[in-house]
């Protein structure tokens, strides 16, 4: 099984669109499109999860545009593109 390394970016991005999923009567939002350095990236699929860092809880999202996977962090009102990797 081949693994692809996450290429670190660590840059603040603007989430310009969201989509919503209703799972077990719990409505959750996911980033649908981000703007990074004037370029728009639209996502086809992804998953979100919570990570506890000390007393702080951070949302992470692994989103795919079909060619690349983007890891996003949502903390407070800030969205950060942690990194990306090519889809294997």
Can you say where each PLM-predicted feature lies in the sequence?
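N- and C-terminal low-complexity/disordered segments
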Residues: 1-88
